[in-house]
Amino acid sequence: MAKELTLSIIKPDAVAKSVIGEIYTRFEKAGLDIVAAKMIQLSREQAESFYDIHRARPFFKDLVDFMISGPVMIQVLKGDNAVAKNREIMGATNPKEAAPGTIRADFADSIDANAVHGSDSLENAAREIAFFFEPHELCNR
């Protein structure tokens, strides 16, 4: 089976709680290798561009404001069925609906401050990875 790549963002709420290491451990235990990573402070322009697909949605401004409220940890994950596997370990968008033991059930506070972002398809993963990383920044593992 070919290995997939997916993008993961540890959002400002989880970065502020100092749970990056715990989340990384979950990725690795699920068979997802971290092949690129960086911590950045998103600008408003970056956040608006990244979440442009949601621009017409009523939550867009709040989402952008939240994503620029503190640093984020961005990583590219590689593994079998990486997109689906990452979404499974993240849990439901609303942490109140997330299965016990998922990242959002354990570390998220609300549907807005929900700890992590993960690509929802291979197509979006490719677009999102290219938004934050140059090809030479991805390491073979």
Curated annotation (Swiss-Prot):
**Sorted alphabetically, which SUPFAM superfamilies does this protein's record hold?**
Nucleoside diphosphate kinase, NDK
S-S pairs: none
Major localization class? cytoplasm
Q: Where is it located? A: Cytoplasm
SMART domains xref list: NDK
Cofactor(s) the protein needs: Mg(2+)
Q: Tell me one GO biological process term.
A: CTP biosynthetic process
Q: Which reaction does it catalyse?
A: a 2'-deoxyribonucleoside 5'-diphosphate + ATP = a 2'-deoxyribonucleoside 5'-triphosphate + ADP; a ribonucleoside 5'-diphosphate + ATP = a ribonucleoside 5'-triphosphate + ADP
Q: Name one GO cellular component term.
A: cytoplasm
Q: Which GO terms describe its molecular function?
A: ATP binding; metal ion binding; nucleoside diphosphate kinase activity
Residues bound to ATP are K11, F59, R87, T93, R104, N114
The record's active-site residues are H117 (pros-phosphohistidine intermediate)
Per the UniProt entry, the Enzyme Commission number(s) are 2.7.4.6
Pfam families in the record, alphabetically?
Answer: NDK (PF00334)
Query: Could you tell me the keywords of this UniProt record?
Result: ATP-binding, Cytoplasm, Kinase, Magnesium, Metal-binding, Nucleotide metabolism, Nucleotide-binding, Phosphoprotein, Transferase
Q: Give the PANTHER family listed for this entry.
A: NUCLEOSIDE DIPHOSPHATE KINASE (PTHR46161), NUCLEOSIDE DIPHOSPHATE KINASE DDB_G0292928-RELATED (PTHR46161:SF3)
Family, as annotated = Belongs to the NDK family.
Q: How does it assemble?
A: Homotetramer.
Q: What does this protein do?
A: Major role in the synthesis of nucleoside triphosphates other than ATP. The ATP gamma phosphate is transferred to the NDP beta phosphate via a ping-pong mechanism, using a phosphorylated active-site intermediate.
Identify this protein by name.
Nucleoside diphosphate kinase
- Protein species of origin: Legionella pneumophila (strain Paris)
